[in-house]
């Protein structure tokens, strides 16, 4: 079949809108009509050329929502008409990682997904006979896409695509880091470094679980108002604060119980660890640093009880947890509407990237 898609031909170049060929689903695969997709910093990270796994030409996009159009042989959990959110972190429920219950990092198809291919090591996308690579197993910058069954979360049918697509990455990454990775408890003091889309979702996750002080740290004073709307209680601007770590330690009577780094800056990661409380402070790294970057601190910081941890996709098990998060949105427990600041047709997707890079948008969403 033919489908309209935004194709990334080379790193550092704008996407071009093409009509590409899409093969139907093979064994264990599902054809999905994407109805809406967010434009995420991770897409830009790959497009910029900084992603060591970036491969071109490719159809990017990993934050979508849509409807099942067809299923391949062997598919048992989905049928035509089901509403779904594609998952860049699948959940097979049978690999060593899934069965351990210690992680959400399913590895069943990781080897091929990282190469831009489907599980059988081929691509479903092509143009004039030239294969086009998949991206993160989802490729939501195409009106139609094929994904493995284990990479699709079935969701309720009354959920609006233009809002819940954001649960495919940003919302889950932020809220999940609080609920599933850190398991923040009532009354805890939390600090969030970086008040973009991920940081705001960390803040609303902290508010959701009943955290006490929720401190936001950002260089942009214009982000304070929105962060307070989502539950932030204190704001620190490093430009006007002599020592951010000392300020947080004083504000929290010895340090934060939990910190979350949502930027991908290794110097900030160090601050995020060292501002946590001696004996039990936990710092969760969410931001993705540039390839080859390393983090450092004095070992004494760890010996005295602080812990550095990472969180991918918020620690969420996609097929299990994403439907719950959709329910939270539909029940009014979390706010997504205020985070989606711009919508556009696929033809304007490059403008969406510019809005994100300039900081004008929290999340731009492409509507098909």
Please report, for each region that a protein language model flagged, where it lies by residue.
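N-terminal Rossmann-fold NAD(P) dinucleotide-binding loop
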Residues: 199-200
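Glycine-rich Rossmann-fold phosphate-binding loop(s) that bind the pyrophosphate
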Residues: 195-196, 288
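Glycine-rich beta-strand-centered segment in the early N-terminal region that forms part
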Residues: 23-37, 50-99, 104, 112, ...
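Adenosine-nucleotide cofactor-binding segment
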Residues: 192-195, 207-271
């Amino acid at each position: 079949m033919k489908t309209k898609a935004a194709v990334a031909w080379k790193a550092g170049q704008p996407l071009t809108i093409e009509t590409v060929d899409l093969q139907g689903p093979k064994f264990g695969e599902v054809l999905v009509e994407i109805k809406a997709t967010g434009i995420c910093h991770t897409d830009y990270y790959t497009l910029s050329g900084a992603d060591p796994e970036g491969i071109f030409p490719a159809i990017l996009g990993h934050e979508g929502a849509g409807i099942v159009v067809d299923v391949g042989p062997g598919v048992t959990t989905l049928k035509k008409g089901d509403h779904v959110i594609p998952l860049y972190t699948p959940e097979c429920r049978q690999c060593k990682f899934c069965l351990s219950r210690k992680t959400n990092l399913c590895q069943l198809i990781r080897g091929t997904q990282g190469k831009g291919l489907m599980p059988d090591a081929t691509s479903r996308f092509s143009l004039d006979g030239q294969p086009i690579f998949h991206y993160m197993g989802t490729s939501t910058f195409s009106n139609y896409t094929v994904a493995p069954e284990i990479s699709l979360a079935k969701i309720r049918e009354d959920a609006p695509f233009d809002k819940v697509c954001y649960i495919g990455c940003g919302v889950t990454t932020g809220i999940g880091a609080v609920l599933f990775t850190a398991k923040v408890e009532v009354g805890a003091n939390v600090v969030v470094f970086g008040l973009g889309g991920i940081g705001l979702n960390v803040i609303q996750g902290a508010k959701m679980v009943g955290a006490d002080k929720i401190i936001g740290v950002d260089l942009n004073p214009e982000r304070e108002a929105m962060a307070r709307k989502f539950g932030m209680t204190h704001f620190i601007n490093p430009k006007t604060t002599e020592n951010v770590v000392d300020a947080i330690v004083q504000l929290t009577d010895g340090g934060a119980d939990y910190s979350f780094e949502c930027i991908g800056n290794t110097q900030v990661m160090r601050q995020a660890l060292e501002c946590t409380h001696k004996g039990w402070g936990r710092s969760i790294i969410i931001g993705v640093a540039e390839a080859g970057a390393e983090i450092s601190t004095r070992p004494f910081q760890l010996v005295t009880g602080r812990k550095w941890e990472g969180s991918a996709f918020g620690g969420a098990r996609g097929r299990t947890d994403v439907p719950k998060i959709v329910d939270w949105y539909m029940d009014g427990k979390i706010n997504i509407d205020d985070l989606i600041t711009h919508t556009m047709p696929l033809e304007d997707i490059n403008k969406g990237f510019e809005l994100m890079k300039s900081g004008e948008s929290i999340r731009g969403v492409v509507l098909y």
